[in-house]
């Protein structure tokens, strides 16, 4: 409500400021009602937003199971710290085990000019303005032009080039004796190379020969597999093995095993159940009716939200199409409208028939023909999408509509601010005019009294 300064009636003796304030309170009643509506609508929008957050969480959890790759999860274990074993996060994983020893680790080719040296790194090591690196395996030649033929200049030029495939180091053989060493960027036998164009240091020799990593697989009828790096892929479908240390002669063979990641998959199911329960609880709290002294929720009796809750429950009770009840995979509804998850029952079903168990959640069929597959996670994704999708989702539209109503009410409140300010100014002028008129009458009365007294 607009307020303003005024002086109480000096002639009338009235508390005109209080009178005007009382009148303005009456005048502002429609604006006060609008402000109450804004407050109520803000609470409604906030409730929709809270439910939307819960439904978005359900959507995220359901998508984690709606993705077929989520069901291909596997866990790899190694009997030795000398080997790191991992499984694919996107493709399929073969379960089973493999036993082997690490015969050798991969190494990069390294060559050094050990027979010659210079007294300082600023001394020249070649009369050529060009050097070459030749890959022994492929025969590919890479050339590099030199502008500085000193040891330091050559090292800097090589290390400043991105396509030579080698790195250079100035090595101190002894005090006052410096030479050049080159090392391949990659490991493996194919990293072997030769150097051309360095004529001031004598011949180069292999400090380390490029070699592949080798695994000796099996314990009796063994065979070997090699890799240019210490990482091996394809020994089992989805398995990646990284060798970190060579096996000693007396070391026992290393066994790597791959098992279905039942705990990880069960955790995703539990997360979806928890998210569904969170959404159901939020909707129930927001839509509950008043009971005795207990107030109702902000959205008490809201049919749209009650329908959303019913849809979640129907998705559970509807099962997984022709496969049957979700109870078979450990999911049930309680009498108070919550979901429960029996991990033991789920894991048992998953181990017994992985493909069938997956189809309860991520199905290939669409019995209803509504574009949403029969799987529980499939249906949850479809339902949650319809509720939360930007612009078109049920909740998104309710939030947008609510915010539009708040804006309209706020604009009307602003109009009332102008109207009430004008009304208060009018009242102040009217009361001021009344005081002026009363003052004039008082003066006339005093004059008449004086005239009568003089008679």
Where would I find each of the regions flagged by the language model?
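Bacterial flagellar/type III secretion structural subunits and associated motility module proteins
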Residues: 1-39, 52, 56, 60-283, ...
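Juxtamembrane membrane-water interface segments immediately C-terminal to a transmembrane helix
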Residues: 42-45
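Amphipathic, heptad-repeat-like alpha-helical segments
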Residues: 47-50
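Short, glycine/charged-enriched secondary-structure capping and boundary segments
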Residues: 115-116, 442, 449
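Aromatic-rich transmembrane-lumenal/periplasmic boundary elements in polytopic membrane proteins
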Residues: 290-292
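C-terminal tails and terminal domains of large nucleic-acid-associated
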Residues: 419-445
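Short, charged, intrinsically disordered terminal tails
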Residues: 446-455
């Amino acid at each position: 409500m607009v307020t303003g300064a005024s002086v109480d009636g000096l002639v009338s003796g009235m508390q005109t400021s209080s009178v005007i304030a009382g009148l303005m309170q009456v005048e502002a009643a429609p604006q006060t009602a609008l402000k109450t509506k804004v407050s109520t609508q803000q609470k409604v929008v906030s409730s929709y937003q809270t439910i939307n957050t819960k439904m978005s969480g359900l959507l995220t959890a359901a998508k984690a199971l709606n993705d077929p790759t989520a069901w291909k999860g596997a866990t790899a274990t190694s009997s030795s710290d000398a080997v790191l074993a991992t499984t694919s996060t996107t493709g399929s994983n073969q379960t089973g085990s493999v036993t082997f020893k690490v015969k050798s680790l991969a190494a990069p080719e390294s060559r050094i000019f050990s027979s010659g040296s210079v007294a300082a790194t600023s001394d020249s090591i070649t009369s050529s303005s060009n050097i070459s690196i030749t890959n022994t395996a492929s025969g590919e030649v890479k050339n590099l032009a030199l502008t500085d033929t000193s040891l330091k200049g050559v090292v800097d030029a090589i290390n400043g080039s991105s396509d030579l495939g080698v790195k250079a180091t100035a090595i101190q053989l002894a005090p006052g004796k410096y030479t050049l060493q080159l090392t391949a960027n990659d490991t493996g036998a194919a990293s072997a190379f030769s150097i051309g164009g360095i004529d001031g240091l004598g011949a180069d020799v292999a400090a380390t020969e490029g070699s592949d990593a080798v695994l000796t697989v099996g314990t009796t009828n063994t065979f070997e597999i090699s890799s240019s790096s210490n990482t091996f892929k394809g020994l089992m479908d989805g398995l990646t093995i990284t060798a970190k240390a060579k096996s000693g002669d007396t070391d026992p063979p290393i066994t790597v095993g791959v098992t279905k990641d039942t705990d990880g998959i069960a955790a995703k199911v539990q997360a979806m159940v928890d998210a569904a329960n969170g959404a159901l609880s939020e909707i129930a709290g927001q839509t509950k009716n008043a009971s005795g002294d207990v107030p109702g929720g902000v959205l008490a009796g809201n049919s749209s939200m009650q329908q959303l809750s019913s849809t979640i429950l129907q998705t559970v009770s509807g099962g997984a199409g022709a496969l049957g009840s979700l109870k078979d995979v450990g999911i049930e509804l309680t009498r108070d409208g919550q979901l429960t998850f029996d991990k033991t029952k789920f894991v048992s079903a998953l181990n017994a028939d992985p493909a069938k168990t997956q189809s309860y959640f991520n199905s290939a069929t669409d019995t209803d023909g509504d574009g949403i597959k029969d799987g529980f996670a499939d249906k949850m994704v479809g339902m949650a999408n319809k509720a939360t999708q930007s612009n078109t989702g049920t909740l998104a539209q309710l939030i947008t509509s609510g915010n539009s109503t708040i804006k309209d009410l706020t604009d009307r409140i602003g109009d009332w601010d102008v109207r009430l300010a004008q009304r208060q100014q009018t009242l102040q002028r009217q009361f001021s005019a009344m005081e002026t008129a009363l003052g004039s009458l008082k003066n006339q009365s005093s004059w008449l009294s004086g005239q009568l007294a003089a008679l």
